[in-house]
Amino acid sequence: DEAGVDKCFLSISLGIGQFDAQTSQKLAMANHDELAQVIAKYPHRFGGYAVLPMHDTEFAVKELTRCHDELGYFGWNAFSNFGDKRLDDKACFPVLERAVQLNMPVYIHPSVPQIPDLHGYGPAMVTSGLGFAVDVTITLTRMIFAGIFDRLPTLKVIIGHLGECFPMILRRMDDSLRVQKITGKARNQKLPSEYFKENIWITSSGNFLAPAFQCAKDVFGIEHILFGTDYPMESLNENVDFIESLGLGEEDLDRVFWKNAEEYFHMKM
């Protein structure tokens, strides 16, 4: 209320998959049930994202379905890595396929990278300072090159922090295929930038640099930017103040704050 935010979409945070399969599954179901009670009490203020441990694909598919059908959840908050696998892994495909069938977007949330070179200098390097952006960028790039968006052409994916590394590298990704024809084992049927026009949206969460926003706007278009907050890791007020400080016109402000979410994801605001 203090920040003027009318509706938030909630999920539990990192860590649900760090235990054995049975414990992780019980924790996920219990957390989903508890969060659903909050949403049911204030449905005009909150919506929910499911968080799924990926030890067992069959469980993940069933729990995502339960979250949608019984609890009214909006999407799947998937991590950028699940320890030994990422979202391009064949074990994850049935869950992505079910998300499409349920018309649930997939938010790729950063997880601590399992990349040795990112470790050794503390949290600032391995988490939000660098590692999170790198890990999400790797995962989404692998999904593109694996042809997942070609197999699931209506899959909708959201990433945060003004698009992680993509605003700066997307053209070079295109050129590596279009000009240099470095295809290797890549199975994507379109240039990477085309999936950002049809399947991928970004949020403004936790990146308060005006030139970075302008870059993301130029690369992706204002229609592909959603308001996000990273709350409680970041300040709600600071997120709102940042967007309002950019000098956007009323139409663009509306698009970022609510219209894109309503138009492309049918979020009820």
Predicted regions and their residues:
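Aromatic-lined glycan-binding groove of carbohydrate-active enzymes
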Residues: I144-G147, P153-Y195
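Mid-to-C-terminal alpha-helical segments outside catalytic/metal-binding sites
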Residues: D1-K7, D33-K41, K62-R66, F74, ...
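Short, conserved clusters of charged catalytic residues that mark active-site
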Residues: K90, P94, L140-M143, F208-P211, ...
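Histidine/acidic-residue-rich catalytic or RNA/ligand-binding cores of hydrolases
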Residues: P116-P123, G163-R178, A212-D218, Y231-S245
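Histidine- and/or cysteine-centered catalytic micro-motif in compact active-site loops
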Residues: S111-V112, L162-E164, S205-N207
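Active-site gating/metal-coordination segments in enzymes
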Residues: D6-R142, A146-G147
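Active-site gating loops and adjacent loop-to-helix segments of metal-dependent hydrolytic enzymes
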Residues: Q114-V136, M173-N199
